[in-house]
């Protein structure tokens, strides 16, 4: 009753995780990937949506995203998200928004969200235009930019995105975040 959804995030590219077959490397192990999703969906019993995030693959020679997306769809995931980079890329280079489009064309019954290189509201609009994704997943782009979510809401509501906050407003926001009690 306290959980709105569970995201199975197979997007971690950090070598200390992937060299042991975890994180972004796990979808390469298709049977294990399938078992994890099937188990999570089964345990949720249609009460909690299970979403799955993954990368394009280990590297350009080991792309797994189309198969991973199909497995997630077949096993009952409610939605999938693609970080449009390989594990090898880590966070370098440009996200391949065309890969998100290919995944969107490959998946027929669940929403496909795109992730990667969303730093400003107009980036999200452009990613959705290029990829035809059903939505965006914001990662590093919101770190230090909490106003990004407000701007995204404005843009997707058909309004102009508000201006970037002043230095004073940013300082105040960060100060408040550090003063807020953690429970």
Show which residues each predicted segment covers:
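Alpha/beta enzyme core
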Residues: 3-6, 10, 15, 20, ...
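Short glycine-enriched, charge-decorated loop/helix-capping segments at active-site entrances
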Residues: 21-27
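Glycine-rich beta-to-alpha transition loops that act as phosphate-gripper elements at the mouths
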Residues: 54-59, 111-122, 140-142
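Catalytic cores of alpha/beta
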Residues: 63-68, 118-134
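Glycine-rich phosphate-binding active-site loops on the catalytic face of alpha/beta enzymes
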Residues: 133-149
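C-terminal helical cap(s) of enzyme catalytic domains, especially alpha/beta-barrels
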Residues: 145-160
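Acidic, proline/serine/threonine- and glycine-rich low-complexity intrinsically disordered segments
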Residues: 169-171
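Conserved small/polar residues in nucleotide/adenosyl-binding loops
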Residues: 173-180
